[in-house]
Amino acid sequence: PFGAEMCKLVPFIQKASVGITVLSLCALSIDRYRAVASWSRIKGIGIPKWTAVEIVLIWVVSVVLAVPEAIGFDMITMDYKGSYLRICLLHPVQKTAFM
């Protein structure tokens, strides 16, 4: 009932949020390892430039990896017991050579 825009937007947001979560946990694990392995180098309070770069990089990589979801999903009309239903699926035949 929401159309092709929502059909493409929901899988895109799902994939992007999973990517952001996984990459953030990886970055957190690396940061905690560095803090434990070299505890004498812990600096003062604040957000270092490298941390800000990591956060931006995590978001950019996650969004870029989620783009194929937005491209591939589409509203498909299917015949089911004599009635036609429009459902949101990964399109079985892609229109571009990308996928």
Swiss-Prot record:
Record-linked InterPro entries: Endthln_rcpt, GPCR_endothelin_rcpt, GPCR_Rhodpsn, GPCR_Rhodpsn_7TM
Molecular-function GO term, any one: endothelin receptor activity
GO cellular component, one term: plasma membrane
Topology of this chain in the membrane: Multi-pass membrane protein
Gene Ontology terms describing biological process: calcium-mediated signaling; developmental pigmentation; endothelin receptor signaling pathway; enteric nervous system development; regulation of blood pressure; vasoconstriction
Pfam families: 7tm_1
Chain ranges passing through the membrane: 9-30, 52-76
UniProt signal peptide: none
Disulfide bonds: 7-88
Organism superkingdom: Eukaryota
Subcellular location: Cell membrane
Keywords: Cell membrane, Disulfide bond, G-protein coupled receptor, Membrane, Receptor, Transducer, Transmembrane, Transmembrane helix
Cytoplasmic side: 31-51
Stretches in topological domain Extracellular: 1-8, 77-99
PANTHER family in UniProt: ENDOTHELIN RECEPTOR TYPE B, G_PROTEIN_RECEP_F1_2 DOMAIN-CONTAINING PROTEIN
Protein's job: Non-specific receptor for endothelin 1, 2, and 3. Mediates its action by association with G proteins that activate a phosphatidylinositol-calcium second messenger system.
Family: Belongs to the G-protein coupled receptor 1 family. Endothelin receptor subfamily. EDNRB sub-subfamily.
This protein's name: Endothelin receptor type B
Taxonomic lineage of the native organism: Eukaryota, Metazoa, Chordata, Craniata, Vertebrata
